[in-house]
Amino acid sequence: MIALEAINVTKVYGTGVNAVTAVNDVSLSVKRGEFIGLVGPSGSGKTTMLAMLAGLLTPSDGQILIAGKDIGRMSEGKRTRFRGKYIGFAFQANNLVPFLTAQENVELLLRLNGKLNRQGRQRTRDLLTRLGLGERLRNRPGQLSGGQQQRVAIARALIHEPEVVLADEPTASLDTERAHQVVQTFADLIHEQNRAGIMVTHDLRMCKYVDRVIQMMDGKVSRTIFDRQAILQLAGSASDLEGVPPSLVAEPASLGL
């Protein structure tokens, strides 16, 4: 079942001679239980695309459907409420509330959705423990390292069991060992909870945990890697997508993108 779909999405900044097209006619879909790696060089449009999928930016053209709802047609108030229920996101600027503990920061999403009860508190503790923060539940953000704060943000993205989970460089502040642990746990939770997940990353080693890799270039989807062997090769030995054999890479047209 498709949880998220982008149809011919374009984002243009500015007007006239100053117009810049950041995303150009991109289509993609993600099924429930599927974890996608979105990669590409700086300026390729991947972060802008993620922000539109999160409902934080409105497309200049095209549609973004989550749970069958076109979020681009919603009023700002309705979209904010929709995001709180259906979308979980962990961006580099994780915006943790400084005077709340790690546990309270994660529980905030449950509180806003009217789901903060004994079961929700236990689920929060279990999730933070699984992310290696079991001994940091009562610490405030200022008492946590950057990597620990990022893991709290990941827990917050998952705790309310959203339809779609989006992450922008979730391992940016983590050492290699912890990065692998966090992304593997992230992927496991997406699969276990049957969510649709997209992770933007510059660290191709993290792609070993995804089900499909989508490359963006100059605002467009340039290629998709769907073969498990190719994904592992990308994550293990290739420095970029050019190192993956063409026979294991699908052009967008062949996938209906």
Predicted regions, residues:
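ABC family nucleotide-binding domain
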Residues: 2-209, 215-216
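Generic low-complexity segments that are intrinsically disordered, proline-rich and/or Lys/Arg-biased
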Residues: 60, 142, 246-247, 253
